[in-house]
Amino acid sequence: MPEICRFYGIILYLYWRDHNPPHIHFTYGEYVCNIRIIDRVVDGKAPAKVIALVNKWIDAHEAELLSLWEKA
């Protein structure tokens, strides 16, 4: 699973050939979550501040993430 970014202890991953809908995986300490790129639905648990930071990162990189998803 390729790591696509790391910040504030949050590690973001994008699996190749993963199931739809487009999403990324992230870890923060013992927390493991998936978050959809388009509608930001979260699967898993993490502190609200961490989810907010991941959402801001996705906002800044949404087009690039969707392009990577299509190529994967």
Pin down the residues of each PLM region:
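A short, structured beta-strand/loop element
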Residues: 14-46
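Short acidic-hydrophobic surface loop/beta-edge motif
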Residues: 3-7, 26
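Intrinsically disordered, low-complexity and often Lys/Arg-enriched segments
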Residues: 1-3, 71
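Charge-dense, helix-prone N-terminal extensions
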Residues: 9-13
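C-terminal structural segments of small proteins and small subunits
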Residues: 47-72
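Residue-level marker of intrinsically disordered, low-complexity segments enriched
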Residues: 8, 35, 49-52
